[in-house]
Each structure stands twice: as C-alpha cells, then as structure tokens.
UniProtKB/Swiss-Prot annotation:
Gene field: glyA
Residues where (6S)-5,6,7,8-tetrahydrofolate binds: L117, G121, H122, L123
Cofactor: pyridoxal 5'-phosphate
Coiled coil: none
Keyword tRNA-binding on entry: no
Lineage, highest ranks first: Bacteria, Bacillati, Chloroflexota, Dehalococcoidia, Dehalococcoidales
Single GO MF descriptor: glycine hydroxymethyltransferase activity
Site (Plays an important role in substrate specificity): H225
GO cellular component assignments: cytosol
Organism: Dehalococcoides mccartyi (strain CBDB1)
Disulfide bonds: none
Keyword Cell wall biogenesis/degradation applies: no
Name listed for the protein in its UniProt record: Serine hydroxymethyltransferase
A single BP term in Gene Ontology: glycine biosynthetic process from serine
Function: Catalyzes the reversible interconversion of serine and glycine with tetrahydrofolate (THF) serving as the one-carbon carrier. This reaction serves as the major source of one-carbon groups required for the biosynthesis of purines, thymidylate, methionine, and other important biomolecules. Also exhibits THF-independent aldolase activity toward beta-hydroxyamino acids, producing glycine and aldehydes, via a retro-aldol mechanism.
C-alpha cells in the first residue's frame, strides 16, 4: 500500500490499525470470517472502474466483454455449487438480495410470515423497523418455549389462519438445523411461496453439511461472506420459472450498476468453495463449535436450545446476572470479539442491552484454531464473564490472547 500511505496517511493508518486488530484479537462473531488473498485481490482489481448496468450480453454500456466473462463465471459457479437452476450474483448485500426476492415474489400489502427477530430471525424477515415491516403485512412465527426450536406446529396453524403469500425462513441467531421439507409442506397447504435466507449457513450448505433448501424453496438468498468466506455481498438462487422476475427485481428495480470487482471476488469465492479443502474447513468449524458448546456448558452457562447443530451458539447470560452489552465490552477489552444478542423469551432485555451473546467459530477455524485453542478461548471467556469489570483480569487475558494469536496467521493478510 505504498501509494495509499503517501497519498492519504489517515486512511492508510486506519487500515493498518484494523490489520493489527485482526491479528491480535480472536474473532468469534458468527457472521464474520477471513477472505483469501485471491478474493482480496479480485475485489481490489480494475473491475472497480467498470460500469456494467444490465446482464451479460445485454449491457447498457460498451466495453463490458470482460465484465460479462467474469459475471458468467460467477453465475455458473454459483449454480454448480448449490445445484440451482438460476443464479443472480449482482446484489450488493444480503439485505438487498432479500429485497429483490420480495419485489419479485410478492406485492406491497401482501401477507408474509417470518421468524421473530428476538427468536433468531433477521431484520429483513419482517421487522417493523425494516422495509419488510413497512411494505408488507407481517405475521411472525417463533420458537417453542420449552425446546427453544422453531414451533412448526404453531407455524402451520398460523399459516392456515392467515394464508400468507410467502413464508420466509432462515435466521441470524438460530443454532439448529432448519427443516426445509416441513416448511415446503406448510407452504403447499396454503399455496404460499417459500423464501429461504441461507446467509449464515451457505458454507455449510455448499459443503453438504446442512440440508440444502434449493430443492424445496422457490427462491434462496444469501450473502457471499460469513461461512462462505467470500467478499461482502449477496446473491440469489431460484427456479428457472422465477429467473426473469428475480433478474428484473435486482436490475432495474432495486439497483443500477453492479459492483463488478465484488462480482469477480464472488466468482473466486465460489471456486474456492468447490475445492475439497473447503469441506474439510466446514467440518472443522462444526467440530470446533461443538467443543465450544461443551466447554460453555462446563462453565455453567445456559445455551439456547441446549446446544447447536451449526456454526454458532447463543448464550443466555441471565442466570449469571450479566447482560450482553457489558459482556461484549468486557470481552473486547480482553481481545475476544463477539456480539451481544437477544435471547428468546428473556425478560427485561432490549436490542441494545440484551440478555445474551452470540458466538461462532467460522473465523477462528479459518485462522487454524482447533479444539485445544477453542477450549482455551472459552476458558478466557469464562474468566472475563465471572470477573466483569475487573481490569486486571481483562489485561491478563488480553496478553494471553495476543500471545496465542501470534501463532496463527490471519488468512488474506499473513498468508
């Protein structure tokens, strides 16, 4: 970055500080990961300069022959990776992929169903503060209070009562496998479309370690980062019968020109996900997450639903008298990066000061952490949580975290 260092020292310094932060902290945010050097190079390529409104072979600008080539690569690889009939790789984010899917599948004012945000859903699945809650009539479904898993029987009851035009599934904080076959059956009973948001579990689905929604869903949306380890962006998969509607909803309805440098990086990430090593990585992520869950239980912490089937765990801190906000700050000071999170059915919590925290292993596993390092990390988490606000404990843990981190290079930066 010699040019940037000279031309804009302020931005250069911020990037260097972020690089140091990445190297010297343990990232347990379930929605974060490290991209490869190849993905970073593609995202910083000359495709940044190219406007390419439209689709391959149907652009509104000249000079798009190589943009066409790279987008076709991304499309073909996405279709192959997920066994889909059609793919659109232009959405700038997962939220915009979701927006396009809504615009293609339902009309403003239609009834939709989505998982309650406080039960693990996402803002774009019907939250009142989101466009979905403002444009559509939203019926929320939730978890069973005893099992803390999706209450499919009540979901079906609500669907029969309200007859939604579309049911949305997928989550941002749900640690269990989703039963796509059951969702499809419920949709068929009420003649509803099924939209599945796999942003969190896309890598697991691609690796064959989580059931794929593609055979059951009318439309599937996702991010290209998180467990997929690509650039920050979105994409959509759908049946061929919806291809035209989806493409039109992305462009010209929702977006203008695609970010071709990001599309190129998506193509690279999809190719990386087709390699045998990617499956090995996802298996290690699941193994590490199981180890994490077991170690958290040993500390006496309560896990929502009792455990996990995927890459994340949701921890209810209410029994130990700590809230998620204070836990997030204390752990950050100790070099462990997590996020606060609401807990289903918890009382006296808000989005800013929730009752729990969400932990995930995708980034730590990409860095090379195995069960031993996860056990060590959970031990530090326990020490910090049991000594909330103790600066001496936080400083001691931070020093140990930095010492461990120096043994594990950060993908895309060190290797």
């Amino acid at each position: 970055m010699s040019f940037l260092k000279t031309s804009d020292p302020a931005v250069y310094n911020a990037i260097m500080q972020e690089t140091t932060r990445l190297k010297e902290t343990i990232d347990l945010i379930a929605s974060e990961n490290y991209t490869s050097k190849a993905v970073l190079e593609a995202q910083g390529s000359v495709f940044t300069n190219k406007y390419a409104e439209g689709y391959p072979g149907k652009r509104y600008y000249a000079g798009c022959e190589y943009a066409d080539a790279v987008e076709e690569l991304a499309i073909d690889r996405a279709k192959t990776l997920f066994h889909a009939e059609h793919a659109n790789v232009q959405p700038h984010s997962g939220a915009q992929a979701n927006m396009a899917a809504y615009f293609a599948m339902v009309k403003p004012g239609d009834t939709i169903m989505g998982l309650t945000l406080s039960h693990g859903g996402h803002l774009t699945h019907g939250s009142k503060v989101n466009f979905t809650g403002k444009l559509y009539h939203v019926i929320e479904y939730g978890l069973n209070a005893e099992t803390e898993r999706i209450d499919y029987d009540n979901l079906e009851k609500l669907a029969m009562e309200h007859r939604p035009r579309m049911i949305v599934t997928g989550a941002s904080a749900y640690p269990r496998i989703l039963d796509f076959e059951r969702f499809r059956a419920i949709c068929d009973k009420v003649d509803a479309k099924l939209m599945v948001d796999i942003a969190h579990i896309a890598g697991l689905v691609a690796a064959g370690l989580h059931p794929s929604p593609v055979p059951y869903a009318d439309v599937v949306t996702s991010t290209s980062h998180k467990t997929l380890r690509g650039p920050r962006g979105g994409f959509i998969l759908c049946k061929e019968q919806y291809a035209k509607a989806i493409d039109q909803a992305v462009f010209p309805v929702m977006q203008g020109g695609p970010l071709m440098q990001v599309v190129a990086a998506k193509a690279v990430a999809f190719q990386e996900a087709m390699q045998p090593g990617f499956v090995t990585y996802q298996k290690k992520t699941l193994e590490n997450t199981q180890v994490m869950a077991e170690e958290l239980r040993k500390l006496g912490l309560r896990l929502v639903s009792g455990g996990t089937d995927n890459h994340l765990v949701l921890v209810d801190l209410s029994p130990i008298g700590v809230n998620g906000y204070d836990a997030q700050l204390a752990l950050r000071r100790a070099g462990i990066v997590i996020n606060r999170n609401t807990v289903p059915f918890a009382e006296n919590q808000t989005a800013n000061v929730p009752a729990g925290i969400r932990l995930g292993c995708p980034a730590a596993t990409s860095r090379g952490f195995g069960p031993a390092e996860i056990r060590q990390t959970v031990g530090w988490i326990g020490k910090v949580l049991k000594n909330i606000g103790n600066e001496d404990v936080e400083k001691q843990v931070l020093a140990e975290v930095i010492h461990l981190c120096r043994k594990f290079p950060v993908p895309g930066i060190d290797i």
